[in-house]
């Protein structure tokens, strides 16, 4: 069962994708580690180095030494006296075993090349056949200026119209005028047709006062 499991793991698409991502992560880790080492530790410092602490104290180094020796000894004893229940199949090919170290070496080479390109300026070789079509042939006067000009003009018109409509009309004098006209119309409609009732009540009040005095 375990012998038949190894080929299925090596040939499955999911496991292949996981292995590829792992190898890419290994290469990237080696790349940025080497670049960090070259750019930070291998260069000249701008300020003189200053050591502000002393790590040669035996009270610090002795516990770390005992911990390291104890871990090495305990690991050797455990792996020597406790054997696995089933022997794992050793059917990995050579390229699979050495893939991690190969990707690490590839990442180191890539980091060194990037560092060399950072400190060395390379000029691209000009191609005279591309000068007419890319520089002054038709791109700038026909395409670049046309679309940019139309886009900027539309944005300017929209912005100006919105500012004029919102601040100068709706919230400015025209907005106040519309508000006052609406209030005047509402007040006028409330008093429309009531003049007869007012005159009638006034005349009736005068008549009652005359009758009461006589």
UniProtKB/Swiss-Prot annotation:
EC number per UniProt: 7.1.1.2
Keyword NAD (UniProt): yes
GO cellular component: mitochondrial inner membrane
Bilayer topology: Multi-pass membrane protein
GO terms for biological process, alphabetical: ATP synthesis coupled electron transport; electron transport coupled proton transport
Keyword field contains Disulfide bond: no
Alphabetized InterPro entries for the sequence: NADH_DH_su5_C (IPR010934), NU5C-like (IPR003945)
Molecular function GO terms recorded: NADH dehydrogenase (ubiquinone) activity
Segments passing through the bilayer: 14-34, 58-78, 92-112, 192-212
Subcellular location: Mitochondrion inner membrane
Alphabetical keyword list: Electron transport, Membrane, Mitochondrion, Mitochondrion inner membrane, NAD, Respiratory chain, Translocase, Transmembrane, Transmembrane helix, Transport, Ubiquinone
Pfam families assigned to the protein according to its UniProt record, in alphabetical order: NADH5_C (PF06455)
Catalysed reactions listed for this entry: a ubiquinone + NADH + 5 H(+)(in) = a ubiquinol + NAD(+) + 4 H(+)(out)
EC main group: translocase
Function according to Swiss-Prot or TrEMBL: Core subunit of the mitochondrial membrane respiratory chain NADH dehydrogenase (Complex I) that is believed to belong to the minimal assembly required for catalysis. Complex I functions in the transfer of electrons from NADH to the respiratory chain. The immediate electron acceptor for the enzyme is believed to be ubiquinone.
Family membership noted in the UniProt record: Belongs to the complex I subunit 5 family.
Name of the protein: NADH-ubiquinone oxidoreductase chain 5
Lineage: Eukaryota, Metazoa, Chordata, Craniata, Vertebrata
């Amino acid at each position: 069962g375990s012998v038949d499991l190894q080929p299925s793991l090596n040939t499955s698409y999911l496991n292949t994708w996981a292995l590829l991502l792992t190898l890419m992560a290994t290469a990237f880790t080696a790349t940025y580690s080497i670049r960090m080492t070259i750019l930070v530790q291998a260069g000249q410092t701008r300020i003189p180095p200053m050591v502000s602490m002393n790590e040669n104290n035996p009270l610090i180094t002795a516990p770390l030494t005992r911990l390291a020796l104890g871990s090495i000894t305990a690991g050797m004893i455990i792996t020597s006296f406790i054997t696995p229940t089933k022997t794992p199949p050793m059917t990995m090919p050579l390229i699979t075993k050495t893939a991690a170290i190969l990707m690490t070496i590839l990442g180191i080479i890539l980091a060194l090349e990037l560092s060399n390109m950072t400190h060395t300026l390379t000029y691209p070789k000009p191609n005279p056949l591309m000068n007419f079509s890319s520089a002054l042939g038709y791109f700038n006067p026909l395409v670049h200026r046309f679309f940019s000009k139309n886009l900027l003009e539309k944005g300017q018109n929209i912005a100006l119209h919105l500012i004029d409509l919102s601040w100068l009309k709706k919230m400015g004098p025209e907005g106040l005028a519309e508000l006052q006209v609406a209030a005047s119309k509402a007040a006028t409609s409330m008093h429309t047709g009531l003049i007869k009732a007012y005159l009638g009540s006034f005349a009736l009040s005068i008549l009652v006062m005359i009758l009461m005095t006589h």
